[in-house]
Amino acid sequence: MTLEAFADTIIPGVKRFPGDRAIAGVCDDAGSVEAGALELLADPATGVAPALVPLSQMLNGHATAYAEGAGLTLDDDVPPFVALGYDDRATLIAELTAPGNPERDGWVLLCMFSTMAFDTAAHRSTAEAIADGHPGLIQMGFAEPNSDGLWRFPDYGYGRELAKRHPNTTESGSPE
């Protein structure tokens, strides 16, 4: 729940159900959590999976200290970071990712992977993510692949052909 609240602070989303505490619900569209931030963070390829429990515990410790410093009373029904309101979550994350914070690298990694889950669906096949309606790719207007699952763009990105096709290029786009 703590890492969901963290990811939701980076790219906020709509609450999944009325009593959803992890998702602050500060926007009307799906955010990082619905886009798969937790799946990406837990993927062994990221290298952060073994650190997720310690980072979550540290984040809750920082949330408790932040709340005490701000004179806030936290609800004991949820983890301390989840109990913070969105603005307080964002302020705390800004402090944790500030230059000079000795823990900065860990928090920046969580921010990056939360963003990547939304912006790129890095934990999924892009074609499958689009077919499944991945919220980040859809919101950004990412083009659907052709019927064979490949992307081809008949119009050049800069309005002109940048280079002639190499004579040894195969139909799949690979050199011979």
Please name every model-derived segment.
Residues 1-3, 7-124:
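Flexible, low-complexity segments enriched for small/polar residues
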Residues 100-176:
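Long, amphipathic alpha-helical surface segments
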